[in-house]
């Protein structure tokens, strides 16, 4: 894994499963994450001791779009009947060929897209680097896999009707 090369974390999104082993993509396949948050929780028994399964959880994410056509994959996920993979790579490094060279840490989440909101800015940017389009998605999580430097840890999320 990469050594920390920045005090500011940079996160990118790839809609593939890093834990599958066949993780090949280029820098063009990545989207910049502006922000994301999620909350996982577990229940307590009658004595107040935490235990049991991790309950149903949501993740919200805002992603910068470089082209309007990039929103299609999120709308495809919205109508899909199976969970989609979303891999978040922190401080990724790419080689001169544009292929992934290294990354610091990563997290792959699986889930159903339940809400999509597009945001457009009326500000005109002189340089094309700051695209005025972003998309906000809400994902009902089914599984999370944390990819650390030494190993991966899986958190299965059980949906309950509570």
How would you describe each model-predicted region?
Residues 1-162:
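Glycine-rich, low-complexity intrinsically disordered segments
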């Amino acid at each position: 894994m990469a050594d920390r090369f920045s005090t500011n974390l940079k996160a990118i999104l790839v809609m593939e499963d890093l834990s599958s082993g066949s993780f090949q993509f280029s820098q063009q396949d990545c989207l910049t994450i502006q922000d994301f948050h999620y909350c996982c929780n577990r229940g307590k028994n009658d004595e107040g001791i935490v235990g049991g399964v991790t309950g149903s959880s949501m993740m919200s994410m805002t992603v910068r779009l470089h082209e309007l056509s990039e929103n299609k994959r999120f709308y495809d996920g919205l109508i899909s009947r199976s969970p989609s993979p979303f891999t978040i790579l922190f401080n990724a490094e790419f080689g001169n060929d544009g292929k992934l060279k290294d990354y610091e840490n990563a997290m792959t989440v699986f889930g159903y897209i339940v809400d999509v909101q597009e945001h457009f800015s009326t500000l005109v940017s002189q340089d094309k680097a700051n695209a005025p389009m972003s998309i906000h998605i809400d994902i009902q999580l089914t599984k999370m896999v944390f990819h650390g430097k030494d190993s991966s840890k899986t958190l299965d999320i059980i949906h309950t009707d509570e």
